[in-house]
Amino acid sequence: LSPPPPPLAAEIRRLGEAAVAAGWRLACLRPAVGGERLELAEAGPAPAYDPAAVAPARDPAAGELGLAVDLGTTGLAWRLLSLADGRTVAEGRGVNPQLGAGGEVVSRLAFALTPGGGELLRRLVLDVLVRLAALAGRKPSALCLAGNSAMMAIVCDKPLAGLAHAPYGLSWRGGETVALGRGLPPAYVPPLLGPFVGADVSAGLTALVAQNPAYPFLLADLGTNAEMVLALAPGRYLAASAPLGPALEGVGLTDGAMAGPGVAVDFELTPAGLAPVLFGGPEATGPPRGIAGPGYLRLAAILREQGVLDADGRFAQNPAPTPLGRRLQARVARQGGEAVFDAAGCRLFASDVEELLKVKAACNLAMAGLLGAAGLATSALAAVYLAGAFGANVSAEALETLGFFPPGLAGRSHVAGNLSLAGAALFLTEPARRATAEALPGQTAIVPLVAPQAGVAGGGDPFISRMVFSYVP
């Protein structure tokens, strides 16, 4: 192995002195120069398709098959389904193979704009699509790809300049069938509503509208970006997007992990204290191997409720107001000069809390911007639909406690599942639904979050002012 370089302060703080002395370093802080011989740590738990679930895809009784794909910045979800009756014959999820090129859209686009970078990223996704298509044992007859505007432009080999830097705009708007090559069927890409409101939103909104929801409602898909649509009436929509980074996907936090076996997706208070709830339900046992984004939010909400965290995100210096809070407070220590909470064997550092505050501020900004642009009171909302893998696991009460959403919305929040994937599947089994999606660009106004309605009374930075664990209108 190559000799380790001198440790950085951040590596000592995060890894501990023993690990640093043993030669471990953080790859995310070390630019590769070539020629190094390295030992890689065991990869954290990442979701992948269950081979047992794939077997039915080879059932000839399913008839012609379609492949629906939701390509996110961090994750990739897919479904093979019968075009005859719409039934699912296989499905799964995993990581976007481009993740090594950057955990959020900006760095991904920057890599794609380097010589050969875009072609490499495109090839990585096409390799996955080819493998998924092969699971059927025969070529799928149809393919639909949904995802944010950047992911769609990269995989479809479209111009990226208007997505990567100002002035932002769309040079390609989707809503058409694209030839991907590699023996894949032509892919239908739903329309892009804006440079930061993509085909995943148009697909998800179409799937939700097909269920005849009551208006007005809010559709929120929180992942690497916060993509929100405020539906005022049929055919009248406001949309906004805010970059969140990969923290809610479990990426970039000290003990973060994508939801999967052995990963804590929730926490609960028991007579014995704080207990993690692992992915997979009550039958999943053992110490957590990491914490997913929803688990981090629930943990922070509990600590906030018990007075262990202050509203500004700092670990409280004053004694917590309840005996339980003081018991939890006793688990706060210092490591590498930073406050850290021991969460059932996992750690919540002060710097992790800061990352959650940044995510909260961006989400709060999008919510306030939409409601302000519509002149709509929170009480007027009929429902909030939480979409995506994150929405399937997150506690609406935690979102309200931490100020992501205004008070009173938790009781009107509903888990909607992966609506982007549902919409992609709908476009395959009911092609007439594509017309509904293709009308959305003309029915949707994009709300810029730097507009005056996104600010706060008295001026100040609208993002910084929302870096508190309470909702700021």
Short names for language-model regions:
Residues 5-69, 76:
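Fe-S ferredoxin-like electron-transfer domains
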Residues 24, 39, 43-50, 188-202, ...:
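Acidic, glycine/GT-rich loop-and beta-edge segments that sit at the periphery of enzyme/chaperone cores
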Residues 48-64, 184-217, 371:
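Conserved phosphate-binding catalytic cores of ATP/NTP-utilizing and phosphoryl-transfer enzymes
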Residues 78, 86-104, 161-177, 203, ...:
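Glycine-rich phosphate-binding loop of actin/hexokinase-like ATP-binding domains
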Residues 97-135, 261-267, 355-358, 362-365:
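N-terminal phosphate-binding loop and adjacent alpha-helix
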Residues 139-148, 300, 378-388:
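Short glycine-rich phosphate-binding loop at a beta-alpha junction
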Residues 304-374:
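A contiguous, well-structured pocket-lining segment that forms one wall/lid of small-molecule binding clefts
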Residues 368, 372, 376-441:
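Catalytic phosphate/nucleotide-handling subdomain of diverse soluble enzymes
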